[in-house]
Amino acid sequence: MTIMRKSHPVMKIVNHAFIDLPTPPNISGWWNFGSLLGLCLILQILTGLFLAMHYTSDTLTAFSSVTHICRDVNYGWLIRYMHANGASLFFICLYIHIGRGIYYGSYLYKETWNIGILLLFLTMATAFVGYVLPWGQMSFWGATVITNLLSAIPYIGQDLVEWIWGGFSVDKATLTRFFAFHFILPFIITALAMVHLLFLHETGSNNPLGIPSDCGKVPFHPYYTTKDFLGAVLLLTLFMTLVLFFPDKLGDPDNYSPANPLNTPPHIKPEWYFLFAYAILRSIPNKLGGVCALVFSILVLALLPYLHTSKQRSLSFRPLSQTLFWALVSDLIILTWIGGQPVEPPYIIIGQVASILYFSIILIFMPIAGLIENKMLKW
């Protein structure tokens, strides 16, 4: 008699994906972040569902409904802060996951990588529309500034902005549709994540050495289920520490004031996880140029498979490329800091230099470093 998990139509899919999946024996803790992203997504969908039961997407009552959730709903404050900080946790895992993909050359699985980039875009869109929902000052002005960027598109820009707004300014229609988008997008992300996994399991996982590991693969369960469980426990411990002790650490105090179209906050800025892209946007004086740079700052990831010049896949044995990788990480941290600063000297020039460096490292220095390393190894 066949084991049920190997014969049942549904169980068979789960079995091939999470139990009998052949996995490289040497993948490190950096490979944990894929499963942690799945955990974050489930957490966000569940907390979001409970928040949606009490939230009203109307300009007059949105802010009060969030206050009502925190004050009157049983554990509403916990659900609200878990959802708000869960977004930050999601992006921390996402950026580490992408960083690991760049470091170990996982981008050479083109289909998996491209779906990953699409997932990143959708996650950013979801986080942006979600930030508008509490209808605080930063919600309103963030929505106004970011949607206004579309007006830089020639010919159709202004019409496109008004179409998204559902009027001539950010108002009730905008809030209602943003709530609809924020509700549906996580389910689209879940479906795409499954496709992401499907393509990954076609090729099998990469490993730190960047070499084929078919001869020594081990089953996913119990080795990596245990490892993922440990990662999840550590992550949830850090997460709950943040939620219960420092719930407002990553938020903006301005969002505790109800939206007021007549009063502009002194510094309009997005959440911390968008600051690097916001800094790149601001570093170009031209509006259309800034928008193009903003989009390309993420889209540049799609070029990585075509810019790979090294004969080795991973950066594990390539000190020159490793130095450039960590320079890129440092550059992104600097851009994140600059994005939160006012537009005045010396921040303007630092932002411009950091933006140029960001694109230069990816498009110029890393491909050249790969060629130099090939020469040094006489390949």
Curated annotation (Swiss-Prot):
Residues that hold a ubiquinone according to the record: H201
UniProt entry keywords in alphabetical sequence: Electron transport, Heme, Iron, Membrane, Metal-binding, Mitochondrion, Mitochondrion inner membrane, Respiratory chain, Transmembrane, Transmembrane helix, Transport, Ubiquinone
Binding positions (heme b b562): H83, H182
Positions with a binding annotation for heme b b566: H97, H196
SUPFAM superfamilies assigned: a domain/subunit of cytochrome bc1 complex (Ubiquinol-cytochrome c reductase), Transmembrane di-heme cytochromes
Family label: Belongs to the cytochrome b family.
Functional description taken from the UniProt entry: Component of the ubiquinol-cytochrome c reductase complex (complex III or cytochrome b-c1 complex) that is part of the mitochondrial respiratory chain. The b-c1 complex mediates electron transfer from ubiquinol to cytochrome c. Contributes to the generation of a proton gradient across the mitochondrial membrane that is then used for ATP synthesis.
Subunit text: The cytochrome bc1 complex contains 11 subunits: 3 respiratory subunits (MT-CYB, CYC1 and UQCRFS1), 2 core proteins (UQCRC1 and UQCRC2) and 6 low-molecular weight proteins (UQCRH/QCR6, UQCRB/QCR7, UQCRQ/QCR8, UQCR10/QCR9, UQCR11/QCR10 and a cleavage product of UQCRFS1). This cytochrome bc1 complex then forms a dimer.
Protein name in UniProt: Cytochrome b
